[in-house]
Amino acid sequence: YVPDYLNEIVEQLVLLWELDTSTFVYGSGKRKSKEQRHYEHLTTFCQKLQEYIQKIEICGPNRNSYSKTDNSATFMRIKTDYMGNDQLLPAYNVQIGVADEYIAVVDVNHYRSDMDCFVPLMEHFKQTYGFYPQYPVADAGYGSYNNYIFCEQNGIEKYMKFPMFKKETKDQKYHEDPFRAVNFRIDEQGVMRCPNDKAFHFLYRKNVRGNQYGRKEELYECEDCSGCPYAEKCKKTDKNRTVRINQELTSMHQEVIENLESIHGALLRMNRSIQAEGTFGIMKNDRWYKRIVRRGIHSVKLEVLLVAIGHNLYKYQKKKMRNRTAA
């Protein structure tokens, strides 16, 4: 139903029953008629439906919550006390790009995930400077299929970690686990086989939900897991094991590992941890900027931008004074 349709039904009932709303009774000791009860129920439905439509329009398609006091803010998990206990509070996701210790670009979003903030930040960088950065180094919160495809389409190198990067590179036991699908043997006919030499057959291919570039996953099922001596280590159910594989994403992860494990990648990672994280540390702890005081995403962007400008001016003056003293 839509509010207009329900309003038409209410109008038809008023004409059919010849209702006069001025004769309706309210309060204790008054008995409402059947017609009045039906009329009030329908009008309540119309009001609630209109309210829900308005809330959905405010929320938009890219988030599932908003604050009543600031419709642009989204509820996020935030560490608020010295014990690290997090609470669900309205907040914004502030993104900065740092180059040579200066804040080069600032962006504010109401997305809860950093993965959704990468592309807007890169577009904002290009809008400001006329080109995309060649080596955007980021932590594991930014490495996704969408962001990697965006980098390929715009000539950007992939230097963003993916969520399992640390486990892939630091945990040798996990990396060489023979029961992981990526470590299964491929025979001469191109068939994937598990450690028990059982073949995995292709079932179907499905689209990954919420992916704008049409990412697809292939599902394979083992031909027979009955009596397998590795069943306890290999699978968690009584059925034949199924695996999901995306060769394109797997190759992207391997490329990211090669980039970040190189000497150039190690230097970039070191600089990112010093400059980007250090900049946030200076803003929060040295400048005591821990809470946004304005409301509305446009006002918040202006506030954060002014803080970034102040940081850059302070950094420039300090460098200038150090160079003058050294000379």
Explain the meaning of each model-derived region.
Residues 1-327:
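Anion-binding and metal-coordination hotspots
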